[in-house]
Amino acid sequence: MPFINIKITKEEGKVVSVEQKKALIDGVSNLLVDVLGKNKASIVVIIDEIDPDNYGLGGKTITQVRRGE
């Protein structure tokens, strides 16, 4: 059973819509079917939306990085 976890940082003023999430889930599932020959019914896809204060890069939060700090 393939397990795919997509992590997306939340962006100020932008929301990932339900339609976009459905498209991600379907698209990633189809990719595994096409490339790896997996059964679509067995593919698990989870989307985590991460607060930019809870994600770091280069010793700074993503919020700081986006502000240019």
Which residues are covered by each model-predicted region?
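A domain-level signal for the structural core that forms small-molecule/cofactor-binding pockets
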Residues: 1-69
